[in-house]
Amino acid sequence: MNISYKWLKHYIDTDLTPDEVSVALTSLGLEVGALERVETIRGGLRGLVVGHVLTCIDHPNSDHLHITTVDLGDGQAPVQIVCGAPNVAAGQKVIVATLGTKLYDGDKEFTIKRSKMRGEESLGMICAEDEIGVGTSHDGIIVLPGDTPVGMPAARVIIRTIMEEG
């Protein structure tokens, strides 16, 4: 029988990790044969990292685009990303699809490439929930807590958030 950690947390108030729950269940005589992570998000969030928006200015050739400078925490110079989200602002921690990342729009796969938007270079994409498959909102980008480490893989952030929310 397979039991979801999220389902179990719905019935048991605990701060234990899945590994710790496995040990606890086994010690109670309920043998856990294996822990398995199931990929329910297409692409598994590969290529997505936490970025820190250092600057955000209005695009001179658009009434809704913004030009941002984003630190990806990789030791390289910050990158310029053009973003159309109404809620993007300097100082935010965000999820960034880096160059080469594969994202999905329904059944269509597309790759994040270096591009120009209204004459300004963009080297990635700051993501909303629906763009990475973790929700349906397209009202704006995902803004993470201020203490989220820059450069952390987005998969770790999303998994941590899901586990915290139960």
Residue spans of the language-model regions?
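Phosphate-backbone binding interfaces of nucleic-acid-interacting proteins
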Residues: M1-G166
